[in-house]
From Swiss-Prot:
HAMAP family membership: Thr_tRNA_synth
Protein name: Threonine--tRNA ligase
Similarity comment: family membership: Belongs to the class-II aminoacyl-tRNA synthetase family.
Textual note on the cofactor: Binds 1 zinc ion per subunit.
Residue numbers binding Zn(2+): C374, H425, H552
InterPro entries: aa-tRNA-synt_IIb, aa-tRNA-synth_II, aa-tRNA-synth_II/BPL/LPL, Anticodon-bd, Anticodon-bd_dom_sf, TGS, Thr-tRNA-ligase_IIa, Thr/Ala-tRNA-synth_IIc_edit
Species of provenance: Mycobacterium tuberculosis (strain ATCC 25618 / H37Rv)
Length: 692
């Protein structure tokens, strides 16, 4: 008989995610977890899998060959939730094949906050289908089917078993390392069978590397959320499948909190608000991922850009412009066509000349839409001789670039094909490099805070060993400098191994929005390679020639993406200084329109965007309409207001300030906007002369 499982030497119990347990050879991990007194079902911290000494996640049914230290993984951890979600995806696939026997299986990985599974079915799934599937899934969960790992004896055995599953067959030999391919990638080719808990007969199974929870009863709470079309493996050249999304959590309470979060996120969805607030659209006639901004959206965008221009001018940047297309040779020089061609639109072959008989007189050449501005900024630097006295040279451009994003990943304004980058490139000496990076990071953080984003951490992206240009020692120096500057900022610095672009390591500023979601925002990239590739030089004080250091920086990332993020951060209620309509006058009756027009004219003289609603709607309906359209200041006037030369403020939270002298009201609004207050104005926050 095996000795009882014990905590590993030097480590006591406590938090299961921090404990280590020794599993005797020939004993299941589940037995060791149970003997250690850790919960195995029914609580949010129940142990669902374990991590072995090599860091691999293992089923609780795993039996090591030798005494082994393991770390229990609880349901309420990231890894625990991921396993629960993957197991729930299997339950979904089982339900689909029971209710839709003709369905062929794609892939079904866990994803952030949920899971999905792709199916080849004749017709799209309907909401009624999802309800029926969820009902069957609950029955499967209640049955307590066992997840049983089975090793295929050979790939031939796997192919024979999967003969009627064409997509699974394709995965048997997959070597892509794609994180979303859960079917293969382990040391062995395995399947997970769902077994009847009483008879242990196989009910259903799937090609899968695992791990999984012990039984379907270990799925505490789940919900199917939606379905959509999706290309097999994300490639539009492949078959179009139907994808069902869902979510699963360690408790019903956690699921309920998540569903509330999803509801709020949907309310803030910039794609929805873009239509409701008449900000932007994506006409089919133009194409996927190509936005047009409407007048109201254009105002917000102009304000974003104008404030940025002002701050860049104050910081010593010089403004440049570059064309949208260029000869292919430029991107051969930069390396983009070697390392980034898949992200570029196809070339335009032009400039060929022909004789009258149709024979070629002058060959044409390829032109590309630019995916980045940096090569052109290198040419601007190289356009004339440069002295050390000019450095640091800070070039800035709102440059529109084009990237061939797959249609399946295009998403509103946050993932587009045509985007305008607030692109800066700084050329400096190596002696100036650290100070320039420090001031640049401070500039980025301060400017983001001016737009109301203040919760940051940093991510350091380092070299991809398979995809980089330049010498190893140059990369090491650049990475070390960025790490030092990031650490000096006092912000958390998270490593991102292999995440750098091909030409240099980078620091990215990660921002949390009002819902606590993280967005990659600004990037600061140190580059010793482009100056070498483009032959950039400056003359030092002693007359010798040197290569400058180049720093790439995009503060917003892109105007479009930043616009989308801000829209969701503020739920469409932009700060008054950004709002397309800052003030609307609402008359009690028609006879008060002329008075409010005078107030609006007074506001406009101070640069305030003011309108008067002279429609036939009743005042109450006008208030509801402009509240829904997120106008920060509503100014009301009736007989008493006109007689007293006053107005009343009405705010979106339904608070009100009555009888404010007209000049005082104008002064309060002008001051609020001039101060660039990012809060939503309320009766409590707005300061009016003579009122405490």
């Amino acid at each position: 008989m095996s000795a009882p499982a014990q905590p590993a030497p030097g480590v006591d119990g406590g938090d299961p995610s921090q404990a280590r347990i020794r599993v005797p050879a020939g004993t299941t991990a589940a037995t060791a977890v149970g003997e250690a007194g850790l919960p195995r079902r029914g609580t949010p911290d129940a142990i669902v899998v374990v991590r072995d000494a090599d860091g691999n996640l293992r089923d609780l049914s795993w039996v090591p060959d030798v005494d082994t230290d393991i770390t229990p993984v609880a349901a309420n951890t990231d890894d625990g939730r991921s396993v629960i979600r993957h197991s729930t995806a299997h339950v979904l696939a089982q339900a689909v094949q029971e209710l839709f026997p003709q369905a062929k299986l794609g892939i079904g990985p866990p994803i952030t906050d949920g899971f999905y599974y792709d199916f080849d079915v004749p017709e799209p799934f309907t909401p009624e289908d999802l309800a029926a599937l969820e009902k069957r899934m609950r029955q499967i969960v209640k049955e307590g089917q066992l997840f049983d790992r089975r090793v295929y004896e050979s790939t031939e055995q796997a192919r024979a078993e999967l003969a009627n599953e064409p997509y699974k067959l394709e995965l048997v030999d997959d070597k892509s390392g794609d994180a979303e391919i859960m079917e293969v990638g382990g040391d062995e080719l395995t399947a997970y069978d769902n077994l009847n808990p009483r008879t242990r007969e196989r009910v259903w199974g799937d090609l899968c590397r695992g791990p999984h929870i012990p039984t379907t009863k270990h799925i505490p709470a789940f919900k199917l959320t939606r379905s959509s079309a999706a290309y097999w493996r994300g490639d539009q050249k492949n078959a179009s499948l139907q994808r069902i999304y869902g979510t699963a959590w360690e408790s019903q309470e956690a699921l309920d909190r998540h569903l509330e979060f999803i509801e709020e996120a949907q309310r803030r969805d910039h794609r929805k608000l873009g239509v409701e607030l008449d900000l932007f659209s994506f006409p089919d006639e133009i194409g996927s991922g190509l936005a047009v901004f409407h007048p109201k959206g254009g105002i917000v965008r102009r304000e974003l850009e104008d404030y940025s221009r002002r701050k860049h001018t104050e910081a010593g940047y010089q403004f440049v412009n570059s064309p949208h297309i260029t000869k292919a040779q430029l991107f051969h020089t930069s390396g983009h066509l070697d390392w980034y061609a898949d992200g570029m639109f196809p070339p335009m072959h032009i400039d060929a000349e022909y004789n009258a008989d149709g024979s070629l007189r002058k060959p044409g050449q390829d032109y590309y839409l630019k995916p980045m501005n940096c090569p052109m900024h290198c040419l601007i630097f190289r356009a004339r001789g440069r002295s050390y006295r000019e450095l640091p040279l800070r070039l800035f451009e709102f440059g529109t670039v084009y990237r061939y994003e797959k249609s399946g990943v295009v998403h509103g304004l946050t993932r587009v094909r045509g985007l305008t980058m607030d692109d800066a490139h700084i050329f400096c000496t190596r002696d100036q490099m650290r100070d320039e990076l420090r001031s640049l990071l401070r500039f980025v953080l301060d400017l983001l805070a001016d737009y109301g984003l203040t919760d940051f951490y940093l991510e350091l992206s380092t070299k991809d060993p398979e995809k980089f240009v330049g010498a190893e020692e140059v990369w090491e120096e650049a990475t070390t400098v960025l790490a030092e500057v990031g650490a000096e900022s006092g912000l958390e610095l998270v490593p991102d191994p292999g995440g750098a672009a091909f030409y240099g390591p980078k620091i990215s500023v990660q921002v949390k929005d009002a819902l606590g979601r993280t967005w990659q925002m600004s990037t600061i990239q140190l580059d010793f390679n482009f100056p070498e590739r483009f032959g950039l030089e400056y003359t030092a004080a002693d007359g010798t020639r040197h290569r400058p250091v180049m720093i790439h920086r995009a503060l917003f990332g892109s105007i479009e993406r930043f616009f989308g993020i801000l829209t969701e951060h503020y739920a469409g209620a932009f700060p008054a200084w950004l709002a397309p309509v800052q003030v609307v006058g609402i008359p009690v009756a028609d006879e008060h329109v002329a008075y409010l027009e005078e107030v609006a004219t007074q506001l406009k003289s101070h640069g305030v965007r003011a309108e008067v609603d002279a429609s036939d709607d009743r005042m109450a309906k006008k208030i509801v309409h402009h509240t829904n359209h997120k106008v920060p200041f509503m100014v009301l006037a009736g007989d008493r207001d006109v007689a007293a030369g006053a107005v009343s403020f009405r705010f979106g939270d339904r608070t009100q300030i009555n009888g404010v002298a007209r000049d005082d009201a104008v002064a309060a609004i002008v001051a609020w906007i001039a101060d660039r207050e990012n809060a939503v104005p309320t009766a409590e926050l707005v300061k009016v002369a003579g009122r405490e």
